[in-house]
Curated annotation (Swiss-Prot):
The gene is gpsB. One of its GO terms (cellular component) is cytoplasm. It is found in: Cytoplasm. The keyword Cell cycle applies. Pfam families: DivIVA. This is Cell cycle protein GpsB. Residues 36-68 form a coiled coil. Keywords: Cell cycle, Cell division, Cell shape, Coiled coil, Cytoplasm. Divisome component that associates with the complex late in its assembly, after the Z-ring is formed, and is dependent on DivIC and PBP2B for its recruitment to the divisome. Together with EzrA, is a key component of the system that regulates PBP1 localization during cell cycle progression. Its main role could be the removal of PBP1 from the cell pole after pole maturation is completed. Also contributes to the recruitment of PBP1 to the division complex. Not essential for septum formation. GO terms for biological process: cell division; regulation of cell shape. HAMAP family: GpsB (MF_02011). Its main location: cytoplasm.
Length: 113
């Protein structure tokens, strides 16, 4: 149920500022009765809305209680080669490879050119 389904006649300010006309014997009873009828209708409307919202709240809480628990997806682990120290770049690897080749093959590489 939405609040559009309920019709409100008075605001708190209107109730506070309401002045009744007085007749010879006090307030005009018809004015007082009309005003009190509107107050009663509003209280009835508020009561209905409160009951509807409480019922909806109970329903939603039960829905939550019965819903399966979902966890946030875990990020996929990133692969990092164990042989590479942190911060090693391709340039560093190529430089190390070049030094290794020079050490293993020595001058043989220069002779083939």
């Amino acid at each position: 149920m939405t609040s559009e389904q309920f019709e409100y006649h008075l605001t708190g300010k209107e109730i506070l500022e309401k002045e009744f006309k007085t007749g010879l014997r006090g307030y005009n009873p018809e004015d007082v009765d009309e005003f009190l009828d509107m107050v009663i209708k509003d209280y009835s409307t508020f009561t209905q809305e409160i009951e509807a919202l409480q019922a909806e709240n109970i329903r939603l809480v039960q829905e939550l209680d019965n819903a399966p628990v979902r966890t946030a997806p875990q990020p996929a682990p990133t692969f990092q080669a164990a042989a590479q120290p942190a911060g090693t770049t391709n340039f560093d690897i190529l430089k190390r490879l070049s030094n290794l080749e020079k050490h293993v093959f020595g001058n043989k590489l220069d002779d083939n050119d």
